[in-house]
Amino acid sequence: SGLVPHHLTSNAMVGKTYASLILGLLTDLSLQGKFEERVYIVELGAGHGRLGFYILQELEIMKAQSAIELPPYCYVLTDIVQKNLDFFIEHENFQTYFERGQLDVAYVDAMVDEDIVLKKSGIVLSKGMLHQPVVVIANYFFDSIPQHLFYLRQGTVASCQVALEADVPVEEV
């Protein structure tokens, strides 16, 4: 049908849960004295951007309540659809986050791109350049890229395919 059940993974409660986990990481890094370098939170296939917005909102609330200095962070909304990225860049609710450097966008084709080029800041995130951990959020991402399945039989690797329907009754599978 082409429909993605977005409410299940892009609601305020899910955003708050992710924000809480991210805050835990930021707190741990701060307690280790690692609060100089920016932490990147990369959402692969951000779609409509709602989850990212909820996470940013909650992080701001939690950051204000934190008793310690946290490392700076930048949430990166990525997508393979340029129209979505343009929407994020123009959306009024995102402007404050862009201005603070807490939000950026990037076109990412997971089958081709090795680097993530941030559109607003011009920063290129590439392998080995960051010293802080990168948080990656991938709701409804891996189901939209080609997958390969292999198994091991008597010391030989073989590929296989998954079928949603069987030629035999379910009881015999």
PLM features: residue spans?
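Rossmann-like AdoMet
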Residues: 1-42, 48-133, 145, 150, ...
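A mobile, often basic/glycine-rich helix-loop segment
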Residues: 138-173
